[in-house]
């Protein structure tokens, strides 16, 4: 059949497995410190980046809707969501967004009614990419969410003879210090042969 085909480079451009969430990543070297992995997840990770547009020709007579010359991009909404299977006090604080870990009792996490600048933090999702994904030179897709804040709250779903599940959602935020900087970046790097 003439159109039952796939691109010849398909197997070099596949993203594989669930990936990981980390607090830090170095794209230049493709290295992750294991102590920066935020937690074990289940069911994979979902990232969405949705633009918000204004149609400046919307109220102009004789102007068709969605005239490309009059389309204005207002902002981006970038979210990442999934389910953690592991949790500790640092992760609970992060999921609550506005919260503090106790100074004298480090087992206690107390929510606040105000958001502090320190509640925002960068989050990276990194997944294996390409047909060459060895331990040293493996390819990756990485998404850097800047100024991320938990907007899904703290949730736990327990079950009989099951692991507890902690659903999460983080939203990237613009900053007044760099209002023109879109708060996410995407890196795609093909792997190379291992030495």
Segments from the language model and where they lie:
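Intrinsically disordered, low-complexity regions of eukaryotic proteins
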Residues: 57-61, 71, 124, 182, ...
